[in-house]
Amino acid sequence: MKRKLFSMLLSAFALLLLMGAAEVPEQAELILAQEESVAVADEQMLETEIQLEVNDVSAEGEEMPEATDEARQIAEEPAVLFDELVLIDGQPAPIEIGRIQNAGTTYVSLAAMAKALDESAAAAWDGSTGTVTVTTEKLTITARMGDYYVVANGRYLYVAEHVGQNNGTIMVPLSVVTKAFDATLNWDAATGTIHVRRGSGALMSGDAFYNQDDLFWMSRVIYAESGNQPLEGRMAVGNVVLNRVANPIFPNTIHGVLAQRNQFSTYKGGKLANRTPNEGSIIAAKLVLDGGVVEEVKDALWFDAMCSNSWAARHKACLVIIGGHKFYG
């Protein structure tokens, strides 16, 4: 009986051992599965962290891309500024033209405005004379600080308030520059905008423009009547002559006006033709023949040498005194 009981116990114990052996693999498999799951999760997390780092690097790269040569050039070039109130062929002029107002006249830098109108324009400065010379393929312009004119292709263009200087650059009226470049100039009063339209690039030369007969007589009468006067005094005499040419009560040519009886005593007996005008008188003649007008005598038809007993002094109103002459209208 005891043996039988012991045998049964052994069998039961063996059975229990067999059952335990079956559970161990299952537990091992479970543990391995859990560890594998954790490893996968860790691997996924690691991949995610790596991807985030890659994305961060990529994002930083997008913020600071490697500059191309073109980008570097653009970055290095200074910003170009424009004068929105001066339009050249519809486009704003560069701010370097330095537009200013002087006695109601718009002045600009001669060198900068020339460059804006013609890319080939080159400027040369002579500090000893205060003169700037601008050259293009078609045009040569010379302006000297303090002068009352600019010379363009041998033409003398009047500057009523004289050639100036601002911030180290020679300044002249915009109207003079546009005339020299054969450009048109218009002002829009509603917007305050100045419109410039390019033309041929250069005005006609002095040799082709000035009528030699007119220049002959005008330079001589200016010299004879006012050769010792300041430039505007000489021009004023020339203006009176041209005012008469334009007035129907006088002859319609310069020579005709001078030859009219009892008008210009310097003409009598051929004396005027035999005069040799000085340089200042020739310049004054060219200025008035090119449209230069001394504002105060724009309506004057007579002048005298401060003579209170002249016909004009007794019958006409004195408009202005310039130098040693009175002018009447």
Which stretches of residues belong to each language-model region?
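Sec-dependent N-terminal signal peptides
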Residues: 8-14
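Residue-level detector of solvent-exposed, low-hydrophobicity positions
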Residues: 13, 95, 100, 114, ...
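Bacterial extracytoplasmic/cell-wall-associated proteins, especially those involved in peptidoglycan
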Residues: 203-329
